[in-house]
Amino acid sequence: MKRILLLLLFGLGVFSAQSQITVDNTLTVQQLVDDVLVLGQCAEVNNVASPMNSDFAGLGFDSFGAFDGTTSTPVFPFDGGIILATNGIDMVPTGMPNQNGGNPPWLGDADLDALISEPNGTNNATIIEFEFIPFVDQISFNYLLASDEYPTFVCTFADTFAFILSGPGISDV
């Protein structure tokens, strides 16, 4: 049973400066999925891609990578994982100095636009998608959505995250 997983994250602004996570932008999208997200031998993973991120806009920074939260004080809720952002991930550990981390903006995502009722649509999409066949009966993913824009842009922008599963035997939810 093949399932397509589409990860989208919009508006991952910053974590508190106290979190002091570290970020790594050196891993490929394939390495992020194989070595960070799908650990061990629990699934067969194919067709890993990032069809939209800051690289497509030629902005000179990375909007995805890995993070390590094991040395953070206070303790960060996750030891590590994948980070998807609407700005450069290098801004995440200490916070964005201004609200222009995603400037100039790059394209949004049509799938997410169809799911939300945002009149202006989406922008600054960072997407990782892949197909996987689980070798277990149950799967789970932990995630955290953070935004430094919320207090400033309430009712102006919708910081949005979507975890979309599709494929045989999966009904639209």
Label the predicted regions:
Residues 1-25:
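Bacterial Sec-dependent N-terminal signal peptides
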Residues 20-173:
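Aromatic (Trp/Tyr/Phe) and Gly/Pro-enriched flexible surface segments
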